[in-house]
Amino acid sequence: MRTLWIMAVLLLGVEGNLFQFEKLIKKMTGKSGMLWYSAYGCYCGWGGQGRPKDATDRCCFVHDCCYGKVTGCNPKMDIYTYSVENGNIVCGGTNPCKKQICECDRAAAICFRDNLKTYDSKTYWKYPKKNCKEESEPC
């Protein structure tokens, strides 16, 4: 619970990418990104290690890898341009770096939506990082 409170406080002042990512997750899944994905498995939330535990956790692994490939801007803070057209997220703007951040977030939000049935809160919500010791696979 303390972790959620800290994250909520941190997000209050955020107007950049993490806030936008939360909106995209909500739009695609109907779920709160902070409440559903901030402390799930080995990769959802801050940092990540080991092997993804299920398809939902793999969405976070792929998202982390995607952010790792972004250069020239800050994936967690920079604001990007997007719209939602007929239920689809469309990344816009002319800045290629910010567009890449948007595409990372878009892909993750869609992945969460497509894998809602794999979400296992009883097993993987607040999953102890000490159980994420397997060797990580490459991005």
Swiss-Prot record:
Gene3D superfamilies with a match to the protein in the record: Phospholipase A2 domain (1.20.90.10)
Lipidated sites in chain (N6-palmitoyl lysine): 23, 26
Classification via PROSITE patterns: PA2_ASP (PS00119), PA2_HIS (PS00118)
Cellular localisation: Secreted
UniProt cross-references to CDD domains, sorted A to Z: PLA2c
Paired cysteines (S-S): 42-139, 44-60, 59-111, 65-139, 66-104, 73-97, 91-102
Required cofactor names: Ca(2+)
Tissues expressed in: Expressed by the venom gland.
PANTHER family given in the database record: PHOSPHOLIPASE A2 FAMILY MEMBER, PHOSPHOLIPASE A2, MEMBRANE ASSOCIATED
Record-stated family: Belongs to the phospholipase A2 family. Group II subfamily. D49 sub-subfamily.
Name by which UniProt lists this protein: Basic phospholipase A2 APL-D49
Source organism per UniProt: Agkistrodon piscivorus leucostoma (Western cottonmouth)
